[in-house]
Amino acid sequence: MSQSVGFNWGFKPSTAENTSSAISTCKVTKPRVKRRFAGEEAASGGSPTYNNRPRAVAKRRTAVSGIQGQPLPLSRALELMDRTQLQSTLLELVKLHPEIQSTFMALQPPSRGLDQYVTLLRGKLEQVYANLPYSRLRDRLPDDTGEGLNDYTFVRVKSFLLEFLNCLVDCLLESIPPQVQNPLHSLKLLDTATGLLSQLPHFSTASNNYYKNVCYEQVAEIWSTVIRQATQDISFLGATSTVLDWLQILQKHNEKSQGKLQRPLSLLQTFQESLEPVQAPAGISQDQQQPSNLWNNIV
């Protein structure tokens, strides 16, 4: 059978006829390919089969069976962040993706509670006093009178002072119409914010008080806007805090600011004078007054 086929299985020696027949067959098939492949191996300097084996073994060694570490889910990562980290992450996220700013603001409430604003503003004011350069100045009460602080002190606290003033204006603008329709809420925050503004330290150089004076001008304009809105709201007239009460509060703020709130004070005085003819006598309590008559007089 082997003679009819023309070759022998394996590498056993064969007859001359079979050998010549096998050689003639290999000339047109495998041997030419093998010789070319051998030439390529000689040019590369080695067998590619042996070069690939270490790589295959290395890949198998890197495969590790068992539990592997993984990052926290988003909800857990947020739980582990403190307030400062969360704020910085949100701000950085909005900077990288400005298109989400409108969505983020749409999810915010239209206004916050009075305590939230006051807590934030008090913290900003405390930062101003905490960064005064001398301990005797840090222990000084805001209402203490005396000569103003020097230029060096202003440089040290300027950034904290501006942060407080900007925060104060931002909080007030969010708490006035049309953002908030409750005039009493706006007036209460104005009362507290104006009191905190008066507690800022005074500087001996007039130019160093520029930012504080500009903020007083803005606060005065906000007072005037809220007073106009309140005098058109009947709920303001029927509230426990009367016009006379707010007039006294605004007079105290105007005295502390050295007349910087004279414009809203005059506006409220004018409105109060228009109510004098319908004010109840001294023996009659305010609860016995008729709100309808008072409202008709305003209209």
From Swiss-Prot:
It is found in: Cytoplasm; Nucleus. GO terms for biological process: nuclear protein quality control by the ubiquitin-proteasome system; proteasome localization; protein transport. One of its GO terms (cellular component) is nuclear membrane. Pfam families: Cut8. It comes from Lachancea thermotolerans (strain ATCC 56472 / CBS 6340 / NRRL Y-8284) (Yeast). GO terms for molecular function: proteasome binding. The gene is STS1. Keywords: Cytoplasm, Nucleus, Protein transport, Transport. This is Tethering factor for nuclear proteasome STS1.
